[in-house]
Each structure stands twice: as C-alpha cells, then as structure tokens.
Amino acid sequence: HGGKDPGTVYKDIYEKDINLSISLYLEEYLSEYGATVVLTRDSDNDLSYGETNHRKKTDFDNRIKIINNEYTDMYLSIHLNYLSNKKYYGAQVFYNKDNENLAKSIQEYLNNNLETDREIKEIPSSTYMYKKLEKRGVLIECGFLSNASERSKLITEKYQRKVAKVIAEAVVNYYK
C-alpha cells in the first residue's frame, strides 16, 4: 500500500499511513541492533511508475525485485487487518513456503507483548506476490483497524513504536 493505494480504510484512517509509521520505527529499532534495513517505501508512495492499467501488479513486481535482491536476508511485510466482524483483534503473522518457524517465533513475541492470542496462518500458495518471493520472511498484520479498541491504539505513536519494537526483538531473537 502507499500512494494511490490506501489499503484498508476506516473513516479518515488509512492503513498505508499506519503501516509506514510502524515500518519506519521498525527500521530504527533494527538498525540499533546492527541490521541493515531496506524499505520498499519510506514515504507515501507506491512502486508503480506513471499511470498504468496494471498499477498493482507493477507495484508488486517492483517490491519483489527489492526483496529478492542478493543482499536481502529477510522480508517483513507490514499490514493491518480488517473484517466486518468487529470483535476480532490482535496482531497475526502469515507465512509462505518454508517460513513457519520464523512466523511462530514472531507470533510468540506478539502474543506475549501485545495482549493477543492469535495463531500463525499460511498464505495461500497462489497469492501473487508471496509465491514469487525467494527470501525468508513473513507478512505481519499488526492489528485490526475494524476493532474500535485496537484502532484507538494503532493510531498512536506510542503503540506503533511498541509494535515495531516487539517485531524487532522477535527478529533479533530468531537469529540468536
């Protein structure tokens, strides 16, 4: 998400903005641990260039190129969830291919530090972007924008930083 693609929306709250904030904080924390972080975006843009009928595919293809480059060890795809049933809440990790152990490790940290009890889920193998990724990594839904209580936290810098810090600690622990 980014640029013309807002992701999920609740009134004037856009997933793309919260994702970007969490990603920038995550970059900060991982860098403090000594990691070299490459962001697919560091501002409100997407990776489609110009006006195109295939904007989403172009965006995905450009993200895939960044992630699959020879210097990348891992990807963390940051998102927010949204369901019509507003009772659901909590950060949840989705994985593809051989990334189940990484997903379990990060989910455990999220559950222990963000008051959730979600379980990991596999990304369907037909999902365009994730079937083309060659690197270790996961998609992290950092919470539900559809849940009023969680939404009220997700829009705050304090909680965005907390989510980013927990993810960073989980990644560092995974490599220990």
Q: Where are the model-predicted features located?
A:
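Soluble non-cytosolic domains of exported or imported proteins
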Residues: I13-S21, K57-D61, K97-N101, L154-K165
